[in-house]
From Swiss-Prot:
It comes from the Eukaryota. Involved in an early step of the mitochondrial complex IV assembly process. This is Cytochrome c oxidase assembly factor 5. The modification Phosphoserine is found at residue 37. One of its GO terms (biological process) is multicellular organism growth. It holds the Pfam family Pet191_N. Disulfide bonds join 30-57, 41-47. PANTHER family: CYTOCHROME C OXIDASE ASSEMBLY FACTOR 5. Belongs to the PET191 family. InterPro entries: Cyt_c_oxidase_assmbl_Pet191 (IPR018793).
Length: 74
């Protein structure tokens, strides 16, 4: 679930998604119960939707077409 705070400063284009991904990984059962690192849990498939959203956000910053025309699929 996305978390947005009004008193937090802007950190960049994908800072919110990155923070949500980190929080999701740290709160997952993989990290809390099994004691694995967040990187290992990410490779196993935890928080896959947020990982894909973060990837799409980073890719849209590099893609000149989506920068000028907007994201595809709208």
């Amino acid at each position: 679930m996305p978390r947005y705070y009004e008193d937090k400063p802007e950190g960049g284009a994908c800072a919110g998604v990155k923070e949500d991904l980190g929080a999701c990984l740290l709160q997952s059962a993989c990290v809390l119960q099994e004691g694995k690192s967040p990187r290992q849990c990410l490779k196993e498939g935890n928080c896959r939707a947020l990982q894909y959203s973060f990837f799409e956000c980073k890719r849209s910053m590099l893609d000149a077409r989506s920068r000028f025309r907007g994201r595809k699929g709208y």
